[in-house]
């Protein structure tokens, strides 16, 4: 046995340095690791499988992650899991082989949604996590969400170090690697979510999963707490035949709308590909952007926890600062960088009760959650909010908010290699304009928020945001006005005009 372990050490020590590109269907592609450097994002990793990373590259990633875990001085034990795509299990096992070569004990929970892997860190008392998922990205993408300090996930510092270890083959192979499969782990997760009183209000809920991973779990959880569940595209099918399971995708939201209206449901709840995000359609079939649902939940939570602190990402509505009910409840909200790792970290740093992202990530600290994002915990929070308002519909609660006109997240293509330079140039443009007393959409600049890209707010409260996507070769553009739809469109026109001065910026995935 000692001899066999020693051989594995030598093999690991000789593991080749990853190449940034290799040609598929060649000897080199099957004999060397390939890892495109741009796949290391701000707080997780994403690649197109085959053209940007191969399985040997994933092995290198696992060895690098294991090396980093030892560097951080954390107990070298890690939860692994994978989402429902045709290739995710293979990617995970390549990752596992690298982790084991680096001396990590792997606790694999199999097919899972991302929050189930986060829960496993607590339930199994394991400090680290590696969830193989491309989240809401289209088929062809793969990636890994990682953490070594529950409930937090990696941020830029850890990702920068991991990138250096992997791309420069700074691996440190160790003894002690092992693999342990945890059978039937989803039952433990579902039991944890449902060990609570059943709802007294009988809610009819459309559960939409886009044929993604959440389809195996979301209907069961909602039924267990007393909902009448109408499943929509909950059969697992990794070809995603109807639409990509993405809660910001208008195709998914429109399918939810149609089913809510057809069945006269109280609410539609849609889950993304790895179950850490959730989108909402009200009983009248209107899609409610996640940031507006966040304001509704903040009202509900702050009524029970006066003076509650919340975190919202910079893409979110201005109502978190101006809503009279939140002010009356003594609630405070801090705008922070977009990204699940950033919001999670800030939530825990300032002791916020909950955090909200326009993309549909919702984070709950005690007494609601454990500090991580979980689409199912959010779904239960929506059901609880409806129960606490027995005479109100979801539409009633939405219509009680001050009126604003806002856009979805609009994403023009921009290559990973240049997107941050473009955003820096846009930021400088608005800073220079503010110094000169210039106008945007016909009004003077009242405020610039630069914590993540640039959010420019003018005198009447209308604002526009430009930031770089952390997950795709895209920018993210959002606009909102508390005045009128026309003012919202004027702001978009003004922001887009600045972007069009940069030829690197391509077509949008959707516009208003």
Regions picked out by a protein language model, each given a short descriptive name:
Residues 305-478, 483-512:
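Phosphate-binding and adjacent anionic-ligand microenvironments
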Residues 34, 142-263:
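Gly/Ser/Thr-enriched, mixed-charge loops and adjacent short helices
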